[in-house]
Structure formats: C-alpha cells, structure tokens
C-alpha cells in the first residue's frame, strides 16, 4: 500500500523532529563533553597546552607599598601610622620550560620562568618607581627575629654586626626607592672584617638567604622579586595531563620528585589541587576548587559565591581567604601545635619562606579585628582586597582572576638589642601584591567560537526540528482522520431528530402557547 504524498511529508517532518530531539538533547551533549575532554587535557598540539606552556598575554602584577609616617614614635612604642602608595604596575609574562611528557603515568614535568616589566603608564598617578618609601628594614628585622627565636643570647653580637653592615643605623627602618627594593636590589656591605659583621655575612651566604644575590668584593644584593625576574625556578613540578581523566588535569602530584612536602604537619604537607594555571571542566556550584601555591607552600580551596558574567559569557565567581587556623581543624596542621596558631587571617611563613613573615589579605581583610587596631591607616574592602576568580563553568576557563596577598612582620620588642627594645611588638604590614588576569577580546572570541556559537546553533536547530516534528505529527493526524470526520459529519444516521408533539388538553385540542403575559395583545405603554 502506497502512502499518500501529504502523509509522506508529515512522516518526514516527524522524522526530522525525532532527529532534533535525539541529536540536540542526547547526542550533542555527549559529543560536546567528549570534545571538551580532548581539548582541555594537556595533550600536545592543543590550544590549551600551548596557552598552559606560555601564556600569550601579560598578567597584571601590582605592588602596593606601605609608607610609615611616624618612625620616631614607633621607635618609642607607638602604633604605626601607614599610608598606602601604589599601584606600581608590572607586566608579568609566565612560561614553563624544560617540559617533559610521561605517557606511562599521564604526567608532565616542568620548571617555571617569569619576566617582569615595569609600566609607569599603568601605575598610580605620577608614580615612577623612584619614590622613596620608609618602612621596617625587612632584612634587619628578620635576622633579629630569627636569632631571638633560636639563639637569643646572640642578639648583642647581632647588634654589633648591624652597626658594621648597615653603617650604625639609628632605627630599624629603611629609606629606599621602590624599584630598588622590589627588583634592582639594595647593597648589603659585607666587606667589613670585624668579627661580628663577618660572622653574620658568612651565615647569610651559607644559608642562602631568600632574595639575596652575592656579588664580588663581598657585596650582597637584596630584593623582594629580583631573583625571580627572568630566572628559571630550580624546582621541578609534576602535574597530571588529564588525557586519561580530564578531571585530574593540572593536578600537582610532586615537586622535585617528592609526593608531599616536609614543611608542615600531617595532611597539610599534601599537594592538593592544580598548579593554578589550568582547572578541570564541567564545574558546578557545588564543586570546591583546589589549587596549590608553591610560593606559600599550601593549597587553597576557593568556594562558589555567585553568578557573574564577563564580556557576554556567563561565569561563576569563586572566592578564598587565608583562613582561621586556630578554629578550622583542616588548617591546624599549618601550626606548630593547635594552641600555637596565629590570629585569624594570618599565616606564618617562617617554615615555608625561611623568613619570619606572615601572609594575610590586604589591609587585614577578614582577619582578627585586633590587627586593625594595632595599625592606623588601613581600610579593608572586600571588592578591593579579596581573592576572587570568575570561571566559565563548562570549560573551566578562568576569565577574570585577582589573587591578592599582603606580607607582614612583627615589630619585635626585646631588651637584648638596643635598636628594638622599645618597639610595640605588634604585627605590621609591609606591602601587598595583586596578580590579575582578564582574558582579552581575542581569547574571549576564540572561546565563543569554539564553544558557545556551536552550542547556540544546536540549541536553535534542535527546537526548530522539534517544532517541525510536532507540526508534522499534528498534520499527519489531521490528514489521517480527515476523511472519517467528514463522512461522520455528512452521514444521515449521524443526525437524529426527535419529534415533539404539541400537548393536548382535555378537549383533545392543542394548547396555545403564551408568548408574553397572559394576552396575545402587546401591553400598552403610557407615554
């Protein structure tokens, strides 16, 4: 039996609709997910691998310095008064070198290299980097703190060494140009032959003090970031490529061949999370992210905050903080013991950086209120000083990121050294940094073309085909039953008429039917 043409068309439309439903709601999500798994893994010759190896645009690296305005009063025990100066803006270019793939366990090893370029045009109004700031002498205060903690009897000798190395300083503060402190370096005179200066300089060289380079004629040079600029980091990092399981992409599993640190206690020595440059796809609001910071020797676990958008792309915002080590059981292993944790919002970096510094959020945001009371001139603001990352959830791409951290030190007070015997003994800020990322138009367009435009096209087509199928289904049903409905309507047997006989009175005469009232005559209307 041959199908009639209208019925064929209807069935064809129904087939198109069925295809739209199967492809749009079943097959396409599977295909998209499979393709994303391939693209997001760190396999060779993919766009993600290329960007992971060398980020093709500069990150924003901003430094904010704290200038101390009441040095004489601080030396007598007064609370510090600070004024923030910044930002000093640097373009930061990041790349990975000495890259090796290991197919057998789906890992990749690499070293890091960063370059920094000062940008006065992007810095704060009028800032050139040649501004002189007054702040606690990080090197002197660090050495005094370490000696006080380990060999307090040696503080007197250290004071004599300071007189030789730093030319008899009148206080524990330094007056220094910003770029000298950050990158160019300040000279430490270790050419003195007296016992105390020579002993201290020998110890500095032997220990390889953080941020120190050694030049001819016993001249040392100290800076905060100079050793990182253009220098290959010696540490070898091992991460998962994510080819076998894309949810493991970028996950740190070893540094220098060691599968855990030997810095903290217990679980805090574990490497948890990615290396911070790549994240797994298919993020949901319930997912807790993890990334490991080798600068701070710890993992961070940002949590979902709210829905956001960036350049027309829907994103999820995740935020993080330093934490409350004393009251969070998961963080107590960062302390020497649970009863020796720093105040809320502070992290002791001595074991990690070999320097008696503390990390916090800028301006002591989300920290113990006492920290703000001990320093004047700080104004914490969640928008300006928090850690936040906006992710595109399907691909796991960070669209916007602002990672901020402040470095602090205790103004050590001890009677065993005249230079610091009257200091307030409180925590005080030194500087804070912001490392920022915002994908430019080129990479946003690339993401849209590869992910969102195909997704939208399929979304339109699947609904269009589903609509065509519905119309075809209705049309086929109408056509199929049209003849039966017409025949049913025109058939004599389909319309039965019931005969109504007039009511007969007692005289066998039909009753009259009254229309209005009791009279056949219309009522008279008075005018």
Curated annotation (Swiss-Prot):
Task performed by this protein: Plays an olfactory role that is not restricted to pheromone sensitivity.
Positions on the Cytoplasmic side per record topology: 1-10, 478-527
Membrane topology label: Multi-pass membrane protein
Disulfide bonds: 268-333, 297-352, 335-341
Residue positions the entry lists as glycosylated: 67, 229, 440
A GO MF term: scavenger receptor activity
Topological domain spans for side Extracellular: 32-456
InterPro entries xrefs: CD36_fam (IPR002159)
Any single Gene Ontology cellular-component annotation: cytoplasm
GO biological process: sensory perception of smell
Keywords: Cell membrane, Disulfide bond, Glycoprotein, Membrane, Olfaction, Receptor, Sensory transduction, Transmembrane, Transmembrane helix
Entries under Pfam families matching the protein: CD36
Protein name in the entry: Sensory neuron membrane protein 1
Lineage of producing organism: Eukaryota, Metazoa, Ecdysozoa, Arthropoda, Hexapoda
Family affiliation: Belongs to the CD36 family.
């Amino acid at each position: 039996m041959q199908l009639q043409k209208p019925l064929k068309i209807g069935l064809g439309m129904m087939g198109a609709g069925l295809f739209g439903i199967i492809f749009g709601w079943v097959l396409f999500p599977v295909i998209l997910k499979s393709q994303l798994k391939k693209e997001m893994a760190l396999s060779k010759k993919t766009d993600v691998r290329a960007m992971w190896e060398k980020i093709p645009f500069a990150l924003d690296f901003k430094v904010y310095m704290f200038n101390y305005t009441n040095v004489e009063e601080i030396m007598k025990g007064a609370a510090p008064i600070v004024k923030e100066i910044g930002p000093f803006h640097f373009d930061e270019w990041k790349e990975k070198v000495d890259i090796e793939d290991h197919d057998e366990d789906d890992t990749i090893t690499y070293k890091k290299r960063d370059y920094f370029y000062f940008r006065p045009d992007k810095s704060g109004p009028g800032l050139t980097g040649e501004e002189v700031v007054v702040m606690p002498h990080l090197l002197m205060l660090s050495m005094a703190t370490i000696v006080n903690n380990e060999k307090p009897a040696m503080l007197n000798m250290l004071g004599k060494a300071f007189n030789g190395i730093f030319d008899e300083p009148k206080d524990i503060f330094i007056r220094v140009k910003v770029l000298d402190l950050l990158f160019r370096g300040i000279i430490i005179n270790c050419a003195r032959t007296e016992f105390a200066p020579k002993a201290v300089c020998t110890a500095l060289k032997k220990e390889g003090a953080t941020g120190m380079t050694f030049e001819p004629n016993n001249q040392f040079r100290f800076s905060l970031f100079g050793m990182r600029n253009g220098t290959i980091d010696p540490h070898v990092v091992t991460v998962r490529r994510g080819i076998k399981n894309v949810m493991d992409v970028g996950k740190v599993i070893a540094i220098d061949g060691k599968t855990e640190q030997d810095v903290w206690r217990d679980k805090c020595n574990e490497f948890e999370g990615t290396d911070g440059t790549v994240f797994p796809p298919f993020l949901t609001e319930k997912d807790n992210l993890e990334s490991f910071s080798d600068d701070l020797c710890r993992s961070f676990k940002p949590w979902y905050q709210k829905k956001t958008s960036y350049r027309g792309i829907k994103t999820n915002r995740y935020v993080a903080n330093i934490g409350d080590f004393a009251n969070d059981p998961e963080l107590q292993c960062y302390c020497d013991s649970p009863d020796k944790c720093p105040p809320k919002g502070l992290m002791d970096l001595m074991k990690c950086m070999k320097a008696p510094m503390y990390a916090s959020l800028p301006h002591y945001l989300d920290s113990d209120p006492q920290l703000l009371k001990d320093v004047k001139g700080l104004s914490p603001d969640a928008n300006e000083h928090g850690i936040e990352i906006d992710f595109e959830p399907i691909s796991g791409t960070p669209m916007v990121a602002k990672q901020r951290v402040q470095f602090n030190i205790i103004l050590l007070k001890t009677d065993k050294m005249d230079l610091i015997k009257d200091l307030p003994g409180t925590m005080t800020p030194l500087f804070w940094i912001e490392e920022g990322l915002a994908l430019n138009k080129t990479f946003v367009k690339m993401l849209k073309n590869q992910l969102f435009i195909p997704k939208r096209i399929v979304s339109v087509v699947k609904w269009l085909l589903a609509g065509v199928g519905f119309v075809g289904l209705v049309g086929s049903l109408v056509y199929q039953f049209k003849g039966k409905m017409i025949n049913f309507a025109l058939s004599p047997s389909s319309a039965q008429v019931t005969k109504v006989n007039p009511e007969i009175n007692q005289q066998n005469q039909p009753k009259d039917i009254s229309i209005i009232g009791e009279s056949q005559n219309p009522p008279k209307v008075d005018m």
